[in-house]
Amino acid sequence: TASWKSYKSGAHFANSCFVQIHPTCIPVTGDHQSKLTLMSESLRNDGRIWVPKKKEDAQAIANGTKTALDIAEDDRDYYLERRYPAFGNLVPRDVASRASKERCDAGYGVNKTGQAVFLDFSAAINRLGKDAVEARYGNLFQMYEKITAENPYVMPMKIYPAIHYTMGGVWVDYNLQTTVPGLFAAGEANFSDHGANRLGASALMQGLADGYFVLPYTISNYLADDITTGEISTDHSAFEQSEKNVKERLDFFMNNKGSKTVDHFHKRLGKVMWEKCGMSRSKEGLEEALAEIKAIREEFWKEVKVPGVQNSLNQELEKAGRVADFIELGELMCHDALSREESCGGHFREEHQTPEGEALRNDKDYSYVSAWKYKGENQTPELVKEHLKFENIELKQRSYK
C-alpha cells in the first residue's frame, strides 16, 4: 500500500493501535468465513440488544432446541440498557462491542460459535407498526434475511462485533505534510482527524476537507519556490533504485517455489490480530502476537506461492504485495498497543480497566500521539511522542452510565 511504502521510506506512522470495532455485524458461522457482514449502526436506533439471563437458555438456542421467541421477557438481559441506563443501546461502538464480547465470553452467546447476541425489533414493531419499521430498515432487513434465511420481523437478528476502521495512519502536520519533505498524505491515509476514536462520516469529512480545502493551498505554497523548476529527469539514481526494488519484489513472488497460498497467510494473520490485538488486549497476548506474526512473516517469504503471470492482470500477485505489508503493519499495531499502558477509545488493555470493566485512561502519562519511525527490516520501530495540547476544551472522560 502507498501508506506503508511511505512509512518504510521515512514517513512516521501514527496511532496504529486505535481500531474501531463495529458492534452490528452478521456473525460468521465457522472458520470457513474470513469476514463478518457489516450492517448499519442505524439499527440500534430502534433495535434492543439482549442475551438470555440463563446460560442454559443460551446453550439451548445455540444447539437449536429453543429460539429467541421461547425466552420470556423477564428472562432476557438487555445488558446495554442495564449497564448504561443513560444511553442504553445507543452507547458508542467500542462500548457496545466490548459489552457484547463480555457476555459471549461469559457463556451467553446465542449461536453455535458462541459469538452472537440478539438485536430485537419486536418492541419497535409493536410501538411504531411494521410498515414504519420497514420504511426505515427494509433494505437492511432484506439483506439480513437473504444471508441468514431468518425473518428479522419475526425472529430477532443475531449480531456480533467486527473490525471496521483504523483511526491511525501516516503522520501529517497541519499542512498535511508527512515527515518526508514534499510528501503529503490526504484523506483516510493519514491519522489527523480522529484521535483514539473515530469521528462520524469520516470519509466524506476527510475527502472534502483535505482534498478541497487544505491541499490545494498547502501543496501550492510548498511548490511556490520551485515554479521555475524544469522537468525532473527520471534518470536519477533514486528512480532507478525504486524501479529495481519493485521488479525484484515482483520477480520473487512469481518465481518463489512455495506451497501455500496468499490467502493462507492472510487468514492466519487475521486470526492472530483478532484474538490478540482486537477488542481486548493484554501484555501477554500482544507479546504472543508479535512472536506469532514474526513466524508468519518468515514462513510467508519462504512458502508463499503466487499463480499466474506477471505482465498481465494478476489479482493474486497484487494480493501478495498487500499481505506482505499487512504482516508488517500487524507487527506495528502490536508494538503500539503494547507501549500504550492504558485503555482509551478503540484501544482496550485488560490490565487497565475499572472494577466495572470500563476503559481506564491514563491521561497523565499517555496524552500523546504515538508516531512510529521505521528502523529497518526485523528492527523494532522507534516511538516518537507528539504531546497533545488542549487549549479551548478541558480533557475529560465521559460516562455513559
Briefly describe each language-model feature range.
Residues H12-K146, Y217-S220:
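An anion/pyrophosphate-binding glycine-rich loop and adjacent beta-alpha core
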Residues T1-S9, V180, S192-T218:
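A conserved FAD-binding loop/helix module that cradles the flavin
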Residues I21-T29, K158-T166, I227-R249, G346-E358:
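A glycine-rich phosphate-binding loop feature that marks nucleotide/adenosyl-phosphate handling sites
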Residues N221-S312:
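Long, amphipathic alpha-helical stalk/connector segments used for oligomerization, subunit docking
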Residues Q33-K35, H194-L204, L250-M254, W274:
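Short beta-alpha connecting loops at secondary-structure transitions
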Residues I163-A185, A189-N190:
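FAD-binding beta-loop-beta segment adjacent to the flavin cofactor pocket
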Residues E299-K401:
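C-terminal amphipathic alpha-helical interaction region
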Residues D77, F191, L204-F213, A337-H352:
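Conserved phosphate/anionic-ligand binding catalytic regions in large, soluble enzymes, centered on
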